[in-house]
Structures are given as structure tokens and as C-alpha cells.
């Protein structure tokens, strides 16, 4: 979350998240939903499907951030918001 805030995003962690969205972030009218994984943990098919549903229902970008260690983060976009919709 610190990296988001350092780049001008408003960000909040979902308390004790056991759902698809761990972090909600917003900046300049854009919304980003993030599922966070670390180590060997992987997002399940069901978690990915739910994260995508969240992205679609809120017209938000949805990503999985996988912390690999030593500060390395692999980011994978699973849904892209439709820009200029409406």
C-alpha cells in the first residue's frame, strides 16, 4: 500500500481479508482492486473469478500482486476498466 500512496493513490486494506479484494485504491477517477499473494500462495480460480466480477461491477482495474521476496512484486492485471464509458 505504501507504493500506491507514494504514487498519489488513496488506498485502504480490507481488514482480515478472506475475500477476493485485499486492497481498494483510487486516483484521478480510476479505481484499482488488488488481491495480494506472497511466497508460494496462488490465487484460486474462484478468487480470480470473484475479483473479475468486482472489477466489472465497479468498472475498476483488477490485479493480483504476488510478493516474491526481496522486494520483488509481480503484478498481473485480470480485468481492465472501460475508460470513457458512460
Language model: regions and residue ranges:
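Alpha-helix C-cap/termination motif
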Residues: 7, 26, 57-58
